[in-house]
């Protein structure tokens, strides 16, 4: 989206966010996989403004590097302005303007870093409305049934915007007003600069309010315009953990609905959480209790869940993933994972492969058609195509100093309870017996067996645990066995 004339956007993110009661700066709290500030900057970037400035104050040392990272991600310049003291929103805008070129003469859009649902379309409509009029400012408004904490819109009898009164300074009758300031404005920069120098701190909070610019411009006879939006969630701010949870749920509801409309079956939207950067293919079914996080990508015709959490996982088409926790892994087409499977970073499961119940994998490649059906740890390993790893096997990858790799060839069959002591290689087509500890390479086609013949120590329990329940049971069994042997030896 681009507009005639120049556009600069100031994002106010200098406040301490004390009501969050958090060591994390408010604008860095996350919703749907992005920080609130990241949501704002993603939306603004779609407008392609000539200038984008983030105004920082509290904890600016922590936030500024993340702004730089977002600038790289979004492939655009984002300037940072510093508000050295918390003197109010009017002062924050004054600081933000200092980051613009002295000869900049376009419009200035002001928004905040704690309205994560504010989208590019809403901003674009505000700018278009402002460009179509001769107003000095166009303010975005909305209506809340409970407008606690929001500045109220005061209108004349002709329904023109007269002023904005902050909640703390509002009279009881003014607090009954339900139309509120959304905290988003489009200003003529000349009018804005002229009004900012007239601000004073004669208010309850002793701050320079940006909202006072409205009444100043009005008194000067300049036109003040307003644009009302019905969808108040788009401009709802976050000041505490309750509001954070409420907006998280609302954004998730919208994300889920978007996927449903696009052809994804989501059995229970109320228990399904999907981050904003997740993609899901057509005809995939998402079962209850599923979380798809980060940049997870799900192909077409997959079955995911129930009770599954995937973070930055790539799932190819027609795969099934049940009751699985996975991070930074890849699941091939037609593969089957779960239940109760743990995919740690670096896991790559090939086409039609299988990772079954109580299997944990890490930094390993499991080839096409290979199977690890149950009760196994696979760490730092490469398993060839169509191999089968027996139950209770362990890839012993740590030698006390560093992680070592194990290589399993194709079409290998390993017995239950096999231990692979890395570094070790098992050749194509080889077998291992149950309980084998593989310490040396196994040639292709060989059978590896390391278990010695079984040795039974007769009457050990009676001697070592005399009088115990086990000894008594053994004695009875021996007596029965003796009688049966005697009966067999007697002639008919």
UniProtKB/Swiss-Prot annotation:
The record's top EC class is transferase
Tell me which InterPro entries the record gives: Bifunctional_GlmU, GlmU-like, GlmU_C_LbH, Hexapep, MobA-like_NTP_Trfase, Nucleotide-diphossugar_trans, Trimer_LpxA-like_sf
Q: Polar residues composition bias: which ranges?
A: 479-492
Please give the residue ranges the record annotates as the region Disordered. 461-492
Annotated Mg(2+) binding lies at 114, 239
Disulfide pairs here are none
Q: Where is this region: Pyrophosphorylase?
A: 1-241
Q: Where is this region: N-acetyltransferase?
A: 263-492
Residues in a coiled coil are none
Q: What is its EC number?
A: 2.7.7.23, 2.3.1.157
The active site annotation covers 374 (proton acceptor)
Picking any one GO biological process from the record gives: cell morphogenesis
Location in the cell reads: Cytoplasm
Query: What UniProt keywords apply to this chain's record, in alphabetical order?
Result: Acyltransferase, Cell shape, Cell wall biogenesis/degradation, Cytoplasm, Magnesium, Metal-binding, Multifunctional enzyme, Nucleotidyltransferase, Peptidoglycan synthesis, Repeat, Transferase
> Looking at the record, which segments are called Linker?
242-262
Which pathway does the UniProt entry assign to this protein? Nucleotide-sugar biosynthesis; UDP-N-acetyl-alpha-D-glucosamine biosynthesis; N-acetyl-alpha-D-glucosamine 1-phosphate from alpha-D-glucosamine 6-phosphate (route II): step 2/2; Nucleotide-sugar biosynthesis; UDP-N-acetyl-alpha-D-glucosamine biosynthesis; UDP-N-acetyl-alpha-D-glucosamine from N-acetyl-alpha-D-glucosamine 1-phosphate: step 1/1; Bacterial outer membrane biogenesis; LPS lipid A biosynthesis
According to the lineage, what is the superkingdom? Bacteria
| GO MF assignments | glucosamine-1-phosphate N-acetyltransferase activity; magnesium ion binding; UDP-N-acetylglucosamine diphosphorylase activity
Cofactor(s) essential for the protein: Mg(2+)
Per the record, its GO cellular-component terms are: cytoplasm; membrane
Q: Does the keyword Cell wall biogenesis/degradation apply?
A: yes
Reactions the enzyme catalyzes: alpha-D-glucosamine 1-phosphate + acetyl-CoA = N-acetyl-alpha-D-glucosamine 1-phosphate + CoA + H(+); N-acetyl-alpha-D-glucosamine 1-phosphate + UTP + H(+) = UDP-N-acetyl-alpha-D-glucosamine + diphosphate
SUBUNIT field: Homotrimer.
Per the record, the similarity remark reads: In the N-terminal section; belongs to the N-acetylglucosamine-1-phosphate uridyltransferase family.
The protein's job, in short, is:
Catalyzes the last two sequential reactions in the de novo biosynthetic pathway for UDP-N-acetylglucosamine (UDP-GlcNAc). The C-terminal domain catalyzes the transfer of acetyl group from acetyl coenzyme A to glucosamine-1-phosphate (GlcN-1-P) to produce N-acetylglucosamine-1-phosphate (GlcNAc-1-P), which is converted into UDP-GlcNAc by the transfer of uridine 5-monophosphate (from uridine 5-triphosphate), a reaction catalyzed by the N-terminal domain.
Please report the name of this protein according to its UniProt entry. Bifunctional protein GlmU
Q: Which organism is it from?
A: Mycobacterium leprae (strain TN)
Give the taxonomic lineage as stored in the record: Bacteria, Bacillati, Actinomycetota, Actinomycetes, Mycobacteriales
């Amino acid at each position: 989206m681009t507009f005639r004339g120049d556009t600069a956007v100031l994002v106010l993110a200098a406040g301490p966010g004390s009501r969050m009661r958090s060591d994390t700066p408010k604008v860095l709290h996350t919703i749907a996989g992005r920080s609130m500030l990241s949501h704002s900057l993603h939306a603004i970037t779609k407008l392609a403004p000539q200038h984008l400035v983030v105004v920082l104050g509290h904890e600016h040392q922590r936030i500024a590097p993340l702004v730089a990272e977002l600038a790289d991600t979004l492939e655009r310049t984002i300037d940072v302005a510093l508000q050295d003291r918390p003197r109010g929103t009017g002062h924050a805008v004054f600081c933000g303007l200092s980051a613009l070129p002295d000869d900049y003469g376009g419009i200035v859009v002001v928004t905040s870093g704690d309205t994560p649902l504010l989208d590019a379309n809403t901003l674009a409509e505000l700018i278009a409305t402002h460009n179509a009029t001769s107003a000095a400012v166009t303010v975005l408004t909305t209506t809340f049934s409970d407008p606690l904490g929001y500045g109220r819109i005061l209108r004349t009898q002709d329904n023109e915007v007269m002023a904005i009164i902050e909640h703390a300074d509002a009279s009881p009758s003014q607090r009954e007003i339900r139309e509120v300031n959304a905290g988003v404005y489009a200003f003529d920069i000349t009018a804005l600069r002229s009004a900012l120098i007239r601000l004073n701190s004669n208010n309850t909070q002793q701050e320079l309010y940006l909202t006072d610019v409205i009444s100043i411009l009005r008194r000067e006879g300049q036109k003040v315009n307003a644009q009302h939006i019905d969808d108040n969630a788009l401009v709802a701010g976050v000041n505490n953990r309750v509001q954070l949870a409420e907006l998280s749920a609302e954004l998730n509801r919208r994300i889920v609905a978007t996927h449903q409309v696009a052809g994804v079956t989501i059995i229970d939207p109320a228990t399904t959480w999907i981050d904003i950067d997740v993609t899901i293919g057509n005809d995939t079914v998402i079962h209850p209790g599923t979380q798809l996080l980060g940049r997870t990508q799900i192909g077409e015709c997959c079955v995911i869940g129930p009770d599954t959490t995937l973070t930055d996982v790539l799932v190819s088409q027609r795969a099934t993933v049940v009751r699985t926790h996975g991070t930074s892994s890849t699941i091939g087409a037609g593969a089957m994972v779960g239940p109760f499977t743990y995919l740690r970073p670096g896991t790559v499961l090939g086409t039609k492969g299988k990772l079954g119940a109580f299997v944990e994998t890490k930094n390993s490649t499991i080839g096409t058609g290979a199977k690890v059906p149950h009760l196994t740890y696979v760490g730092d390993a490469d398993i060839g195509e169509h191999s089968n790893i027996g139950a209770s096997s362990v890839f012993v990858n740590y030698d006390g100093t560093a992680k070592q790799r194990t290589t399993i060839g194709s079409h290998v069959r390993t017995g239950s309870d096999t231990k692979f002591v890395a570094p070790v290689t098992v050749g194509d087509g080889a077998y291992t017996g149950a309980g084998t500890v593989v310490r040396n390479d196994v040639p292709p086609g060989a059978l590896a067996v390391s278990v010695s013949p079984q040795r039974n120590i007769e009457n050990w329990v009676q001697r070592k645990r005399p009088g115990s329940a086990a000894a008594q049971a053994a004695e009875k069994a021996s007596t029965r066995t003796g009688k049966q042997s005697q009966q067999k030896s007697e002639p008919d």
